[in-house]
From Swiss-Prot:
GO biological process: cellular detoxification of fluoride
Regulation: Na(+) is not transported, but it plays an essential structural role and its presence is essential for fluoride channel function.
Catalytic function, reaction form: fluoride(in) = fluoride(out)
Function: Fluoride-specific ion channel. Important for reducing fluoride concentration in the cell, thus reducing its toxicity.
Single annotated GO MF: fluoride channel activity
Pfam families reported in the protein's UniProt record: CRCB
Keywords (A to Z) from UniProt: Cell inner membrane, Cell membrane, Ion channel, Ion transport, Membrane, Metal-binding, Sodium, Transmembrane, Transmembrane helix, Transport
GO cellular component, one term: plasma membrane
Transmembrane segments: 4-24, 35-55, 71-91, 103-123
First and last residue of the signal peptide: none
Protein name: Fluoride-specific ion channel FluC
Length: 127
């Protein structure tokens, strides 16, 4: 149990610091697109897609490694709450196009990145 908590703690800490840094470096570049949030979600989606494919092909790996990457790292890196708050702020300020673009890029982009990474890792590990 302690090793699992430690895995979540370490992965979550690394992911959260990475998300914070992405926000600091990129969120102010485009006023109508919080790029740091988008990058955090797209990178996290790619990592979890690749991890899912990898772990499916390596079921013998210790569960704590899976939890460190998925629940910890990806959970700390990605941010549905910040994304949701940004959409609401766009809507409150009447920026409907920015809100719609943010929703489209984050949701569709994250799904595409997850699928892309899953397919890529599957292809690499079977060839």
């Amino acid at each position: 149990m302690f090793s699992t908590l430690l895995a979540v703690f370490i992965g979550g800490g690394v992911g959260s610091v990475a998300r914070w840094q992405l926000g600091v470096k990129f969120n102010n570049l485009y006023p109508t697109l919080p790029l740091g949030t988008l990058l955090a979600n797209l990178i996290g989606a790619f990592v979890i897609g690749g991890a899912l494919a990898f772990f499916l092909r390596h079921p013998h790996l210790d569960q704590d490694w899976k939890i460190l990457i998925t629940t910890g790292l990806c959970g700390g890196l990605t941010t549905f709450s910040t994304f949701s708050a940004e959409v609401i702020m766009f809507l409150q300020s009447g920026q409907l196009a920015a809100a719609g673009l943010h929703v489209l890029l984050n949701l569709a982009g994250s799904l595409l990145m997850t699928a892309l990474a899953f397919a890529l890792v599957t292809w690499v590990t079977t060839h």
